[in-house]
Amino acid sequence: MSGSLPLRLVLASASPARRKTLQAAGIEPDVLVSGVDESLVASDRADELCLELARLKAQAVLTRLRPAQDQRTLVIGCDSVLEFDGQIFGKPADSADAIHRWERMRGRSGVLHSGHCLVDVTAGRRAEAVASTTVHFAAVSDDEIATYVATGEPLVVAGAFTIDGLGGPFVERIEGDPGTVVGLSLPLLRRLLAELNLPITGLWSRGTSTHPTPGTSATPKPNPGA
C-alpha cells in the first residue's frame, strides 16, 4: 500500500536557499530544475501569480519524473514575488533595475508572497497555498545599495534582496515566517502534507540526529567488560 511506502520529496527548484531550508529541517530532497520561464506568466495579483508559477514548476517536473515503485513520490514547486506599492517584483532585469528598486524600497515595507504546490505523484493528489510575510527594509544609503547590487546577489532573487545572505543587514524586521522570505515555508509545508494525510516527520532523512535529553550524554559510555 502507498501509505506504508517511504516518502521521497522532489524539489522543483534550482534555489540553493530552498534546498538548504529543507536540509536544515532534516529533509534531503532530490532536485529537478523545472526550467519554467517566469516572465511568460502575468497576473495583477501577486498571490495568484506566485501560486500559478509554483503549479507550473511542479507540473514541468512531473512530466520528466519517473516515480519509483518502492517510494511514495512527492513534488514541491515554489515561487516567490514581492508586492510593493501595488507592483509585483520578481527578479530584477539587471543591475540598474535592482538599484532603482532599492531606492524605492529603502525605509519602507513590502509583502513577500511564496506560492507552494505539493503534488503526491503516487496517490494522484495535490495541495497548494500561499504564505505571505511583511518585510520592513532599512533606510540604506546609496553606497550600500550600489555595493550590494555589485555583488550580484540581488539579481537572482525575487524582490532583489535576501534575509539569509548579504542582504540580511538591510532588512530591519519581518512579520511572519522567515522561511516565506527565503522561498519555502516549513510550517506551510507541514500543513500541506497534513492535507494529504502525510506527516512531515516521514520526510526526515535516515540518520537524522536528535539532541540528547537532559542528564544524558550523546557519547555512549564504555562497557567495562569490553
Curated annotation (Swiss-Prot):
Keyword field: Cytoplasm, Hydrolase, Nucleotide metabolism
Active-site annotation: 79 (proton acceptor)
Co-factor(s): a divalent metal cation
Enzyme class: hydrolase
EC identifiers of the protein: 3.6.1.9
Bias type Polar residues, positions: 206-220
Top-level taxon of origin: Bacteria
BP-aspect Gene Ontology terms: nucleotide metabolic process
Keyword Hydrolase tagged: yes
Gene3D superfamilies linked to this entry: 3.90.950.10
Listed InterPro entries: ITPase-like_fam (IPR029001), Maf-like (IPR003697)
GO molecular function, one term: nucleoside triphosphate diphosphatase activity
Cellular localisation: Cytoplasm
Pfam families membership: Maf
Catalysed reaction, written as an equation: a ribonucleoside 5'-triphosphate + H2O = a ribonucleoside 5'-phosphate + diphosphate + H(+); a 2'-deoxyribonucleoside 5'-triphosphate + H2O = a 2'-deoxyribonucleoside 5'-phosphate + diphosphate + H(+)
Function summary: Nucleoside triphosphate pyrophosphatase. May have a dual role in cell division arrest and in preventing the incorporation of modified nucleotides into cellular nucleic acids.
Family per record: Belongs to the Maf family.
Protein name, entry field: Nucleoside triphosphate pyrophosphatase
